[in-house]
Amino acid sequence: MSFIAVAFINAMVDLGHKIIIQNTIFKIYDDQTQVALTAIVNGLILLPFIFLFSPAGYLSDRFSKPFIMKASAFSAIIITLLITLAYYQGWFLFAFFMTLILAIQSALYSPAKYGYIRQLGGERHLSAANGFIQATTIVAILGGIIVFTVLFEWLLIDQRYHDEASLLRHIAPAGWLLVILSIVEWRLACRLTDTNKSTDFLRFPWKNYINGHLLKTNVKNLYTNPVIWYSVLGLSFFWGISQTFLAVFPAFAKMVLAENNTMIIQGLLACSGIGIVVGSLLAGTGKHGLIKTSLIPLGAIGMS
């Protein structure tokens, strides 16, 4: 249960700060500026997972999975304290930049999380465990959207603001919720047991990573397994379309629907996560740990 709680809180903390920044952008900016800034926020969250998947995977193999999760959880405490400081000082650009730092922390944590699932459940229960942890993550995201959006609007009741700085100062107490959640996550991560020891013999090829050769090699390796390659392509299309919609819809709702309440906007966007929860649980119902590859084209049809 500690592992599930760690995954839940980690997703909620990542989403919580993003929601606050997105809602701030929604309240202050309009039209193309709002769409562009929202797209940048989404990009800052996704890019670390692309550029850091090689070193993140190395760290997950080099050190024990619980150690990586403990270190990531502790770093989240420091990051959320800095974010809270930015809220109180009204440092919008700094808080905006901390979105990237928080995403880097999550990108380094992610391989250890999924590797730990395999250690706990083994090959036989891998499919069901992956589906359950994915559903847990999405539920955390939905919960984070509701909690932080409601808190955001509540802190702005009867408050006046004219720019990002004044708005952030009003909602600054929300930062302490991020800090508290990070502390709880770290305490729970400290309870995780080491099932595998560190491996001292692994060395990361930094030179190949910097010049891009390692990335090319990893991408080429995807071609060796068509199922993995097509799954990666499908996920790329899904998240590409999803992030485009998430960036455009708030501006559309504000301009066309004349809706300025972020609880309604974020609530509508949160509905998209319900389908992901159902799909994750459905994908985890394979017998004997087998992954239902037949669901991949079904998912593609549903997306189209």
Report residues per predicted region.
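Loop-to-transmembrane helix entry
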Residues: 31-46, 169-173, 254-273
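Helix-loop junctions on the cytosolic side of multi-pass membrane transporters
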Residues: 115, 119, 167-206, 289-290
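Small-residue-rich packing faces within the transmembrane alpha-helices of Major Facilitator Superfamily
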Residues: 77-84, 179-186, 304
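A helix-boundary/kink motif common to multi-pass secondary transporters
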Residues: 30, 34, 64-65, 91, ...
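Substrate-agnostic recognition of the 12-TM MFS/MFS-like secondary transporter fold
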Residues: 2-19, 41-60, 64-77, 94-153, ...
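Transmembrane helix-loop junctions in multipass membrane proteins, especially transporters and channels
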Residues: 58, 88-92, 153, 157-161, ...
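Transmembrane alpha-helix termini and helix-breaking/packing motifs in multi-pass membrane transporters
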Residues: 20-29, 84-86, 141-178, 251, ...
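Juxtamembrane intracellular "pre-TM" segments in multi-pass secondary transporters
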Residues: 1, 192-233
